[in-house]
Design a protein with these regions (language model features):
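Short internal beta-strands
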Residues: 30-35, 82-86
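General small-molecule cofactor/ligand-binding pocket signal
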Residues: 8-9, 53-58, 106-109
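Structural signature of eukaryotic scaffold interfaces centered on beta-propeller domains
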Residues: 14-27, 64-76, 119-121
């Protein structure tokens, strides 16, 4: 497993893919603190909220790939958040409002094959193109 190092100790509990636990955008970060070792949660929270609005993701949302989003920018400079429909449906209404406050829009598509057989979601798929 890969994770952040604090001293010489990993701060992320076992997870098959660390890129599903969080995404970081220009102004917002979506993160699942449940999978971060308890003694490091406050440190990570303070670090990310210094420059970003924080959307806390639950463990079930993590399994629905809510942390596997990607911020993209169009040629007019507008920011969008790309995710799977599975992730979109897993966000709460208040979380969607937080997202829409920070982005021009949300782009989501159904990605069942990527999510079931690829082990990732929208960000994993799109990051292969960069």
């Amino acid at each position: 497993i890969n994770g952040c190092l604090v001293g010489s100790e990993m701060c992320i509990r076992d997870s098959y893919h660390t890129d599903v636990l969080m995404y970081i955008g220009t102004n917002v970060v979506g993160i699942c603190f449940d999978v971060i070792k308890e003694k490091y949660r406050e440190l990570v929270l303070e670090s990310v909220k210094e420059h970003h609005e924080v959307i806390e993701l639950s463990s079930p949302q993590l399994l629905d790939f809510c942390g596997n989003c990607l911020e993209v920018e169009n040629n007019c400079g507008d920011l969008f958040l790309v995710m799977s429909t599975r992730a979109y449906k897993s966000y709460t209404g208040s979380q969607i409002q937080q997202i829409k406050k920070n982005y021009k829009g949300v782009i989501h598509r159904d990605l069942p094959v990527i999510e079931r057989y690829g082990g990732g979601s929208a960000r994993c798929m799109l990051a292969e193109l960069f």
